[in-house]
Amino acid sequence: MIRASFRASFLGSLLFVLVACGSSSSIATPPTTPTEPAQQPEFGEGPPLVTPGERMTYRVELAGFELAQMTLAVGDVTDLGGTKTVIVQGHAKSVGLADRIAAIDDTFTSWIDVESGRSLRFAVDEFETNSKTNIEHTIADLAARSGDQLPITFALNDATPAPEPQKLAYPDAWDYNAFLVALRAWEAPVGTAKSLEVLRSRWLWHIDVTIGGKDKLTTELGELPALRFDATTHKLTRAGERDPGSDERRFSVWISDDDGRVPLQITARTDYGDVKMRIVDYQPGTGQRLRP
């Protein structure tokens, strides 16, 4: 039987690539000897690799038991404070027995600069842990960053938003959607690593991500060539220090190794068993791809 506390330790962390509850991970094949490519852009450098109208749908499973559906959708190009941005929105919805035990209906919205690929604003609306009525609202104003301080506000239901400034360690801060979009475009030799700070919901997480190697992945869309990224992560406090209650987690992401660079699967090993988020449908969009 799935306990009600399951939401706090797994489902509530679903959108951050299934890592907030993991212990060890990684379905891995040994990396091959890298071939040095021509000059490659840095992580996240340049326009985001998305197409307006693009939509990806995933099934989330724990040991073969379906828990939730997740979608990642790309909206239109829109103006935000005088800057052209593209809206990218993630949505997680619990299904079946999991929905009756711990309802999830959470939305994560990013406004990503169409030139730099950096997120300028990140808004989250999600159920409070173990509640089916109270909704938490978090807004991170990444465009208003000042020095090492990132303005974040938090409110429960209709309460007045309270400031929760976040201290940062790196020149760039990412949110979950922008991180996944940047991962799509990242090309470098196998073994190349990057340290990042990424917002997942209300909190900031430190991630060390490495290009792991090439695989063949069997999906509902067929057998596809894939590039694997392996990572570790831990939660940070508002002061930018490692949260003493946060263990190091491991996860892997597979992205199609073709022109589409579509996120195909995310896996983690959790205290409850193996968790997989697998693609079940892909719509390429009808607009102009923002990254040539």
Indicate residue ranges for each PLM-predicted region.
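N-terminal secretory signal peptides that target proteins for export/translocation
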Residues: 1-6
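Short linear sequence motifs
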Residues: 9, 51, 58, 115, ...
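Bacterial N-terminal signal peptides
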Residues: 9-20
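Acidic, serine/threonine-rich low-complexity disordered tracts
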Residues: 21-146, 185-292
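Active-site/ligand-binding surface loops and adjacent short beta/alpha elements
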Residues: 146-200
